[in-house]
């Protein structure tokens, strides 16, 4: 009998609670491997660190940091690092678990990990940001490495943060270790195509889902929540395919134009000031009205838990593409399924980022780098192969794409765990 974890008390709609619910749903499809399922309901390792730095005004500030390695049965841990004032251990645990599922779903030789610091980076100077990054890297350095756990960018982190992390780790081990992180600048071993990879993956899976639904992308109405690298890139690619982006929401507010927003003008403004600064391009509406906008495709590409049961009842979308991690709570998932709304789940839909991170890692070890066309061809092939296998599983068992994705991924993870056995 396995005891429940003592250090978290998840609710049904909390990130960890959502993840546990998703795992429970696939147990009937695991056969004899189900005896190992408890392995997926607890992290392998959870590290909490104190991150003290001297601020520009001379005061000493302390920040709380985390690195969680959920499961590494199939390979090194892989997952991003986020800087956000609301980061919690439970959230990082869930994100690391979703990385375990995600890497297995697209059949990459990784496990799942995630990290974060409870900090608002917008309130830090560049010097303070570098200090907190380097101190955090030093604190988690005991468990990360090119063959053990490879961080990457996530919310409020970028290539510069990864460069500082790589340099700090390298200084501590006495040699340049470019493979310790991915999402690096190109001249430090980064990969072409990495910045747009997650958004491209959303487009590739969404295009195939629309085809299977008989939905013509030409003229299709799309609403996008979150307009960073994921949301904006996906929006651009869908617009190029003939779709209309009728609503966009970011941290500043919501803009709507039923005739389609002009992305060529919106994106530069949004990157600098947020979407509400583009007042001439559409109507600024209350944030909750975003969920009432008439659309064919909904792309949640912000944070977790955005599609609640109430919002699932509101949306007119026939297709939901989860660009964010964990954007749909379990009750909302059930409502969408009952309403006949197809959901392409996060653990396959937004796997483009980790796939190109894998390409970067491989290129770093070989010191041989591919051009962007080759990156995109390989990315599209991996995403389509994974989606087709998941779709076949869903059709075979008459289950949702999310449950099918978890069934495929969990079988791979637990088979690896069973074949490796327990030591000692």
Language-model region placement:
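Short, Gly/Pro- and small/polar-rich lid/capping loops
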Residues: 7-50
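Adenosine-phosphate binding glycine-rich loop
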Residues: 7-14, 209-210, 313-424
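Flexible, glycine/charged-enriched surface loops at secondary-structure junctions
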Residues: 33-39, 107, 144-153, 175-179, ...
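Glycine-rich, N-terminal phosphate-binding loop and its surrounding beta-alpha-beta segment
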Residues: 49-121
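Glycine/serine-rich phosphate-binding loop and adjoining beta1-alpha1 elements at the start
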Residues: 84, 103-218
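Glycine-rich phosphate/diphosphate-binding loop of Rossmann-like nucleotide-binding domains
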Residues: 190-294
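Rossmann-like adenosine-cofactor binding region
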Residues: 253-343
């Amino acid at each position: 009998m396995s005891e429940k974890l003592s250090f978290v008390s998840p609710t049904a709609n909390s990130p960890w609670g959502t993840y546990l619910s998703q795992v429970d749903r696939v147990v009937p499809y695991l056969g004899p491997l189900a005896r190992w399922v408890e392995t997926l309901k607890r992290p392998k390792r959870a590290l909490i660190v104190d991150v003290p730095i001297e601020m520009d005004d001379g005061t000493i500030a302390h920040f709380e940091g985390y690195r969680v390695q959920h499961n590494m049965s199939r390979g090194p841990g892989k997952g991003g690092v986020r800087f956000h004032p609301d980061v919690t251990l439970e959230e990082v645990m869930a994100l690391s678990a979703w990385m375990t599922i995600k890497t297995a779903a697209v059949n990459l030789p990784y496990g799942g990990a995630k990290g974060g610091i409870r900090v608002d980076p917008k309130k830090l100077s560049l010097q303070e940001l570098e200090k907190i990054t380097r101190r955090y890297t030093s604190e988690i350095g005991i468990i990360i490495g090119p063959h053990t756990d490879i961080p990457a960018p996530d919310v409020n982190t970028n290539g510069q943060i990864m460069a500082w992390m790589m340099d700090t780790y390298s200084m501590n081990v006495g040699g340049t270790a470019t493979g310790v992180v991915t999402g690096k600048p190109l001249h430090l071993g980064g990969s072409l195509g990495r910045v747009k990879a997650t958004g491209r993956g959303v487009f590739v899976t969404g295009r195939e889902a629309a085809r299977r639904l008989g939905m013509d992308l030409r003229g299709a109405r799309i609403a996008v929540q979150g307009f960073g690298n994921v949301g904006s890139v996906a929006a651009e690619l869908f617009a190029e395919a003939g779709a209309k982006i009728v609503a966009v929401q970011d941290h500043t507010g919501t803009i709507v134009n039923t005739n389609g927003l002009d992305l060529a003008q919106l994106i530069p403004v949004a990157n600098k000031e947020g979407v509400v600064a583009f007042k001439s391009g559409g109507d600024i509406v209350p944030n909750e009205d975003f969920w009432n906008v008439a659309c064919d495709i909904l792309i949640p590409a912000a944070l977790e838990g955005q599609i609640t049961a109430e919002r699932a009842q509101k949306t007119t979308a026939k297709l939901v593409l989860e660009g964010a991690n964990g954007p749909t709570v379990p009750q909302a998932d059930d409502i969408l399924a009952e309403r006949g709304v197809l959901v392409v789940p996060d653990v396959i839909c937004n796997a483009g980022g980790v796939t190109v991170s894998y390409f970067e890692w491989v290129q770093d070890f070989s010191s041989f780098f591919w051009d962007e066309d080759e990156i995109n061809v390989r990315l599209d092939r991996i995403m389509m192969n994974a989606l087709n296998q998941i779709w076949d599983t869903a059709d075979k068992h008459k289950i949702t794409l999310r449950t099918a994705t978890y069934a495929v991924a969990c079988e791979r993870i637990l088979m690896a765990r069973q074949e490796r056995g327990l030591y000692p």
